[in-house]
């Protein structure tokens, strides 16, 4: 199966490298306006292939996306230190207005995965521009935030994060919502698990975890200029779910008519794309926060629609 990646920057290249190391697909095509950069990234990753899984990694143009099962769009300008994801919107929206129609004209059967920030609004824009069937466009959403959330909870509780079931929903950004009320380990709520295991837990710890997740990208950008390893792994995981029909539950972003914008909720991701909305149990406070998050996104989307 072929995966096309549009954008040879940090995120696109790291996603390609993650796929090569994981054996996510049989062919990767990297497309970028800077042809020399796309060629260099593809060559560099191709030289790592003998140490992982057999596959083809090459550069190409839009025509080479024909036949791709998954097309990842990671093209765009980088987030500056101190800049919110929403402030990126106008700079990246014009790039998508150019790219998306070209992608659909060449391969309308591919599932489009948006990775460029602000990902929720650009996912909404991509859905509008593409005109593809429901479920065929998604954003990486809060998949990385959810992984960070589970990792920090697991570290605090002394549990493998893979056995922590907790979700970050809403915007991939400052208004994201932590669904604490449904978070659990082995079917036990976090407070119940901590009581049974005699692990210290209080609102201060809970608030610190949420704050660390929300500010993670800002700290990384401040230290090295960009985030890419985490999101690269996320894009590899999403691609595998699509290519191998994993029917994985992931907090990808997609449009919800009820909210009038794309945002993240747990969804079933299969070979056909988004195969249904799973949703998540929330309390009144979390539901209100989710509605506020949707309002933030709608306001930003209205500025470019």
UniProtKB/Swiss-Prot annotation:
Assembly notes: Homotetramer.
Any one GO molecular function term: L-lactate dehydrogenase activity
Keyword hit for rRNA-binding: no
Organism: Chloroherpeton thalassium (strain ATCC 35110 / GB-78)
Record-level GO cellular component terms: cytoplasm
Binding site for substrate: 79, 85, 117-120, 145-148, 227
Cross-referenced CDD domains: LDH_2
Classification via InterPro entries: L-lactate/malate_DH (IPR001557), L-lactate_DH (IPR011304), L-lactate_DH_AS (IPR018177), Lactate/malate_DH_C (IPR022383), Lactate/malate_DH_N (IPR001236), Lactate_DH/Glyco_Ohase_4_C (IPR015955), NAD(P)-bd_dom_sf (IPR036291)
Protein name: L-lactate dehydrogenase
Recorded family membership: Belongs to the LDH/MDH superfamily. LDH family.
